[in-house]
């Protein structure tokens, strides 16, 4: 495999719920079922999935019919740049993950190992955030 493409489903905080690593020449629509269906089968509380224009078509219809979840494809009008709603959350997650050296280079032979590295990087990031947000108690000086 010459290159890899990561497809991920994140929550509103930008935390990775499910990740799939496939060939770089694989279209987004082909990789999305690995991610979307796996999460929707295990998470009954999810009511809405936001996606960009690369996920239009049969996937949208299948998700809404089978799982009764709103699958909203965010589109932009015109040729000018415009900020897409909630798109920055996913891009921010990719930026967080790109800070990990193990993910910037392709060290693994198997895509499954790369997925594991994505999850490990996300766990490390979440633990670091929990540690930085803990309350520190000041000791009183005698």
Describe each region flagged by the PLM.
Residues 23, 75-80:
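Short, acidic/turn-prone active-site loops that include or flank metal/cofactor-
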Residues 1-70, 122, 136-142:
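Polybasic low-complexity intrinsically disordered regions
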Residues 57-61, 66, 80-142:
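Basic, amphipathic alpha-helical segments enriched in Lys/Arg and hydrophobic/aromatic residues
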